[in-house]
Amino acid sequence: VDPGGRRVLLITDELSPATNLGRMIQRMRTCFSGGIETIDLSAEGPQGDCQGCLRCADANICVYQGHDAFMELFRDRVMKADILILAGTVTDRYLSARWKRFFDRSFFMGHVPALRGKQIGLLISGPLTQNANLRQILEAYIEMQQAHLAGIATDAPTFSGAIDDQVDALAQRLVACAEHGFIGSSTFLGHSGRILFRDEIWGRLRFPFRADCRTFRRLGGFDFPQRHWRSRLTNALLLFLSSFAPFRRHLQGRMTDEMIRPFRRYLKTR
């Protein structure tokens, strides 16, 4: 398949040719003329877990900046690809810990659709057909990114030729959808998620998620009026005060405590 000059990127946590996933990846590579770029999460992935500190909320800059290269990898390679292929193995009813870390750390981009307009294919080894929850998580993630799930290839068939046919068909669909710029209609997963984050980023979460607010405004995400005057006035004050570095540092130091403050009465130990 000729991708027509489009950038194709495969992200995986397993490249061993001794595994089903490794063999599916090898087959996918042969489907594209000129080869495809690959990111091996075991070698190039993030080196630490998300700290939940929300330092990224102000300007999409992770607290790990300077400690690993994940932020640059995500921006320069993942976000600049036209076609993404995510490859993983079902592990304990989810994907591997490396994939979990990848998804968690990519939150430095906040709630915005960082993969907007991309064609995404999934190569999954393991009983995905028996794990509706995992499938829905992956589908929701892609819809929330305003990307298009071109298809899923698994090793569920016992006949290797059938698996090869799935992989070949997925490669063809990825290129065909990219050529036509096709993005499928959003289901409840994507539509409700978009509305939820639209409301929250406009209202209660406008501070501290200043970067999200700017991006939502630029993309036309705030597509209805709101009258949450208390939240709007509070956020206006905090946005103004946070323009001063000493106050911003003070707020960042209290961020974690403030996030759990509404739940303290439920978290008290005897």
Positions of PLM-derived features:
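Short, glycine-/small-residue-rich phosphate/pyrophosphate-handling segment
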Residues: V1, R116-D155, I163
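N-terminal beta1-alpha1-beta2 submodule of the flavodoxin-like/Rossmannoid cofactor-binding fold
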Residues: V1-H111, L149, D165-A171, V175, ...
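Short histidine/acidic/glycine/proline-rich micro-motifs that form metal-
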Residues: E14-P17, V90-D92, G126-T129, A156-F159
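Short beta->alpha junction loops
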Residues: L41-E44, A153-S160
